[in-house]
Amino acid sequence: MELAPLFNQMPFARLLGIEVTEATEGTATARLEHSDDLLSNPTGEVAHGGATYALADTAGGAAVMSLAGIVTPTIDMRIDYLSPATDDLVADAELVRYGDSVAVVRVEIHDVDGTHVATAHGTYKTSGQGEETPWGEDSEVGDKVPDDLR
């Protein structure tokens, strides 16, 4: 499944301008262009923390889905803001562990000049998304998850 186009069609990601540029083998990269619509106050140049958080969550979800092959809802996301976001952002997500029911992802967010803006840790649901839930049907993960991530 090609995930970048799928994520780029998600209404919330489109609203914010988040673009998933790659999602494969437990990693993902996403970008967010800095704009006045994302500012935390009308007279500043710092993006609202929620925009950075949404970028991290989108990249983290794409990394998990690249192995799961199913929608993987966020259970928990923790973020440490390290520098003000005053430029375009890039999020690099990497799967830390993929278990039978949850996956853990680490996301590093930098601006385009390389300034470390935030670090996030996310937990995503990897099973139980049956037909009766809003997320759709389960699918088999098969052998896609490397042993060192289990």
Name each region found by the language model.
Residues 43-57, 61-62, 76:
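Compact, glycine-rich, soluble single-domain proteins
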Residues 17-45:
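Catalytic strand-loop segment that frames the active site of acyl-thioester-processing enzymes
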Residues 35-39, 59-60, 85:
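Short, charged/polar surface micro-motifs in flexible loops or helix N-caps
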Residues 61-92:
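Hydrophobic beta-strand-centered segment that forms part of the acyl-chain substrate-binding groove
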Residues 86, 96-150:
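HotDog/MaoC-like acyl-thioester-processing domains
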Residues 1-11:
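N-proximal, solvent-exposed amphipathic alpha-helical segments enriched in charged/polar residues
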Residues 14-16, 26-28, 71-77, 87, ...:
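A generic structural signal for short beta-strands and their flanking turns/coil linkers
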